[in-house]
A protein has these predicted regions:
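Boundary at the C-terminal end of the N-terminal hydrophobic targeting segment
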Residues: 20-22, 224
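Sec-dependent signal peptide cleavage junction
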Residues: 23-27
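Short His/Asp/Glu-rich catalytic/ion-coordination signatures at enzyme active sites or charged loops
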Residues: 149-152, 197-208, 213-217, 356
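C-terminal capping alpha-helices of c-type cytochrome domains
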Residues: 154-201, 289-305, 309-320, 330-401
Length: 401
């Protein structure tokens, strides 16, 4: 009999079974365990994570998650039928595309690196600049961005889901809607429900820190953890709690990335951006089609001068699988990332002083050996799996396996 891990969110119960391992990391990235070990991994697959937050107005059901999965992978929702959500958030590449910036329809490129969907359910806001508060809002944007899916509006998507027999039946089953009653909000809720099942804990670090297995990480990784907490000051933003670790404060910081090319022009850029925004400019489109506008960061959302060049702290979970790094994909390796911080947020080391740099960013004075230790620790944050969770139907109480 399968061993199941059950945890509740209000009336919703999630469960795990070996079937959840249908979406696994690339074999070159993560080794699959013997079948005899699978159940143990299933039982502990959320070690180190808190309960997944589920919106009251969008409860999880197996049918909704399955519908969201189909929508996430449907390439028809793009101007030329070549781009789906999974094009930039590939199941087999840790739900990223491993490119500096993503490639949309017709080979067009944007300005920002595609963050992993793994554990995105825990963020307090979505996108690098936090311009959407939740996964529902986030899921709508890429379809109508000119350098992503490229649709002129959401109407082509609604035409498909309202007329495709399989989608008609699924939306009727999940939301009890049909025809014009079926809106983009329903599409977004299904996609978001699917994305909330893409969670992964149980890394070697979790087994060491939360599971009490002192042999789960190497001595070098333990030294790196000490640096993470101490001299490296990483934990200031990539936070740890007593019973879980999201490795993000969900806040926004200017860490120096991307500022070299624009900092002398920031006053003019900020003024021009605000003028365009006040005249009805779409922030989503402006920041993904204009490299310089992109570097304004959180300012583009809040208009706050203190947030110029500030971007959201990403989780460090599974970071060894999601290269290249930073909001613009400009750093190729974890070692480059650590060196950037070691230099006080300056890359290259000869770059001019950044007046917008967040106050906590300063030289760390790490030795080469310490840099290697810290990188080794970051590699210990890789989960053995990042499965889709199995969801119990909150209306029937039955588990979907």
């Amino acid at each position: 009999m399968c061993r199941l891990l059950l945890f509740t969110f209000s009336t919703v119960v999630f469960s795990f079974s070996p079937a959840v391992f249908s979406q696994q990391p690339s074999p070159s990235a993560v080794n699959s365990p013997p079948a005899s070990e699978a159940n143990a991994l299933v039982v502990n697959s959320l070690l180190g994570l808190p309960a997944v937050p589920i919106p009251i107005n969008n409860p999880q059901t197996p049918a909704k998650v399955n519908l969201g999965d189909k929508l996430f992978h449907d390439k028809r929702f793009s101007i030329d039928g070549t781009i789906s959500c999974a094009s930039c958030h590939d199941d087999n590449q840790a739900f990223t595309d491993n490119l500096p910036v993503s490639v949309g329809h017709g080979g067009l490129t944007g300005t920002r690196n595609a963050p992993t969907v793994i554990n995105a359910a825990f963020y307090k806001s979505q996108f690098w600049d936090g311009r959407e508060p939740d996964l529902e809002g986030q899921s709508k944007g890429p379809f109508i961005n000119p350098v992503e899916a490229g649709l002129p509006s959401h109407e082509p998507i609604l035409e498909i889901v309202r007329t495709d027999p399989a989608y008609q039946a699924a939306f009727k089953d999940v939301f009890n809607v049909a025809g014009k009653q079926l809106t983009m909000d329903h599409v977004a809720k299904a996609i978001a429900s699917f994305e909330r099942t893409i969670v992964a804990g149980n890394s070697p670090f979790d087994r060491f820190y939360f599971g009490g297995d002192k042999n789960a990480i190497t001595e070098q990784q333990q030294r790196g953890f000490e640096l993470f907490l101490g001299q490296g000051r990483c934990v200031s933003c990539h936070t740890l709690e007593q019973d879980h670790a999201l490795f993000t404060d969900s806040r926004f910081h200017n860490i120096g990335i991307g500022m070299n090319a624009v900092q002398d022009d920031v006053p003019r850029l900020a003024e021009a951006f605000l003028a365009a925004k006040n005249q009805g400019g779409d922030v989503d489109k402006m920041v993904l089609t204009d490299k310089k506008a992109s570097e304004l960061g959180r300012f583009a959302v809040t208009d706050g001068l203190s947030e110029i060049g500030a971007f959201k702290t990403p989780t460090l979970r599974n970071v060894s699988l999601t290269a290249p790094y930073m909001h613009d994909g400009s750093l190729k390796t974890l070692k480059e990332v650590v060196i950037h911080y070691n230099n006080g947020g300056v890359t290259p080391a000869t770059a001019p002083v950044n007046p917008y740099l967040s106050g906590g960013i300063r030289p760390l004075n790490l030795l080469d050996k310490q840099i290697d230790d810290l990188v080794a620790f970051l590699e210990a944050l890789t989960s053995d799996y990042y499965p889709k969770t199995q969801v119990a139907d909150s209306q029937t109480g039955g588990r979907h396996e």
